[in-house]
């Protein structure tokens, strides 16, 4: 994107839902050129939650808990390296975050684990009746957040 003549080199945001929501946080935590983030129900979040009696995030690799023969110590250790919670702790940019209470793909407990790990300025929009999708109001709030961060609104 930095090689494109249309890009001003300053106004860079990451924006996405589910796996895109996860990647929006991961990229922003790794690249200081990102100025703000919009993340809807990020996947890859709190993936070890099942081991502690709560729903874990997509792709639900540990859904069978500690009883799975596939849950080797190496696997459990490696998962933490790409769990979004790990990246959210390092986020320095403002973020708009939104999720719904009825999401079975990326359960609210997993997404709140990410949100609660963020120390940068953050806004939260919870839509109780929403599942694994975004309503137009959520999208509008996300776009408005970006415009506000860039002093365009």
Which residues fall in each region the model found?
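Glycine-rich nucleophile elbow surrounding the catalytic serine of serine-hydrolase chemistry
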Residues: 16-26
